[in-house]
């Protein structure tokens, strides 16, 4: 059987890629006491370290962990759309810290498990009117930006 080569996404726009960034975890193992009180950070540049938030919102260097992952996919020329999957209580918080962008960004609620959140992201992608132009999907955990 001969392997069929599938072209990879590139800058020519022949195959678009969607990024699903999964950030719906509450990070209870990383928290002391397992309790969070969402702060209303209004930008990636806020000086709070954010330990009262899930770890994807903790500061790493000059911005939250999730911002590092988001920025990478946002800058990548093959990424046509980004779907951010966030725990329901943090959707407003995420919306407040997102920078303005030219790429379509879709913010949706995640599920009880990582698998449920990935499924929610894929369902949201399938519902986009131009999803037939997406040839690849990159699924990334926001809490692992490096």
Residue ranges and their predicted role:
Residues 25-28, 88-90, 112-113, 142-145:
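Short glycine-rich anion-binding loops that position phosphate/pyrophosphate groups of nucleotides
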Residues 73-74, 98, 125:
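Hydrophobic C-terminal alpha-helix "anchor/cap" residues
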Residues 91-97:
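Acidic helix N-cap motif at the loop->helix transition within catalytic regions
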Residues 77-78, 99-104, 130-131:
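Short helix-capping segments at alpha-helix termini
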Residues 15-89, 105:
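N-terminal glycine-rich phosphate-binding loop and ensuing alpha1 helix
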Residues 112-146:
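Conserved beta-loop-beta/alpha segment of the NTase-like Rossmann-fold superfamily
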Residues 100-114:
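Conserved donor nucleotide-binding strand/loop of the catalytic core
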């Amino acid at each position: 059987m001969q392997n069929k080569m599938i072209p990879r996404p590139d800058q020519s726009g022949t195959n678009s890629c969607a990024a699903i960034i999964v950030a719906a975890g509450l990070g209870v193992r990383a928290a002391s006491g397992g309790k969070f009180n969402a702060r209303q950070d209004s930008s990636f540049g806020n000086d709070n370290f954010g330990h009262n938030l899930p770890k994807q919102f903790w500061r790493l260097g000059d911005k939250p962990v999730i911002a590092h992952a988001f920025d990478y996919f946002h800058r990548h020329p093959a990424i046509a759309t980004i779907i951010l999957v966030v725990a329901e209580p943090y959707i407003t918080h995420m919306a407040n810290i997102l920078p303005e962008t030219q790429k379509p960004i879709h913010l949706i609620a995640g599920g009880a498990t990582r698998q449920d959140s990935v499924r929610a992201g894929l369902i949201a992608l399938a519902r986009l009117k131009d999803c037939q132009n997406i040839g690849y999907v990159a699924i990334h955990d926001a809490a692992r930006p490096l």
